[in-house]
Amino acid sequence: MQIIIRDYQKEDCSAILEIINDAILNSTALYDYNERSLASQEEIFVEKLQKGFPVLVAEQNARIVGFGYFSEFRFREAYKFTAEHSVYAHKDHIGKGIGKALLTELIERASQQKLHTLIGVIDSENTNSIDFHKKFGFEEVGFIKESGYKFDRWLHSVFMQKMLK
């Protein structure tokens, strides 16, 4: 089945909210504790778009099956050529090429925007995501012990980086 990657539209947000809230409640993909509201998620995306960052949607059979974006890595001016990205697939579509299609397009958009490097911050237990990023040329460049606390345990963050050409 064909995967269509396109720019986010406001009416996509409720489908995206289902994906992100599932990740919040059932995984360490996000270090949030509480589900997001539709209004708060819309606000997050509006802010990214207003700053010129892409928010992308993966669609298959007219259904949203994933999304991704990049935005500031840090808020100091000297970091303006570095972005942090995130990619999420619906739990029923993991391992089916959704993340690959999204990350491929995000890397292309980052290059078009003349970014120098992309950063991914991944929970250390998420070895599938770490291996996935390595396939795209990301390298492990940092490890922060006990940087988060969720599900009654300390979590460690792996920083992965891809230099763009």
Each model region followed by its residue ranges:
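Conserved acetyl-CoA-binding loop-helix of GNAT-fold acetyltransferases
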Residues: G95-E108, D131-K135
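Acetyl-CoA-dependent GNAT
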Residues: D7, R36-D92, L103-T104, M163-L164
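Conserved GNAT-fold acetyl-CoA-binding loop/helix
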Residues: L17-V46
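Conserved GNAT acetyl-CoA-binding A-motif
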Residues: A110-I122
